[in-house]
Amino acid sequence: MKLYLDTSTPETVLGLDDKEYRSPLGRDLAENLHQFIYDKLIENNADWKDISEITFMSGPGSFTGLRIGAAVVNALASELNIPLYDHQGNKVPLILPLYDRPANISKPRK
């Protein structure tokens, strides 16, 4: 089963083979992404081990959403020992997010 994931916007998009699912996970992405994926696998009579490859929409987009999504797909691909592809179809060893602007991180206090 091919898995596609896009966490670049507040609405998460998950593809499983030819089916597409959307969920407004937004600020709850980190807490609920694994369960969202697992629930959809179960709906399709599948399990984690049935995933044969992963494609990830690596950006541009939300800093936090891309960071969380990239961490999840990188971990899944590594654990399941399956191929990982960026949104352009390139097989990659690791997803590196493409942010739409520099991260707004405050300077450290002196």
Regions found by a protein language model. Give the residues of each.
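Oxyanion-binding and handling regions
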Residues: M1-K49, S78-K110
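DPxDG-like acidic metal-binding loop motif
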Residues: E53-S58, F63-I82
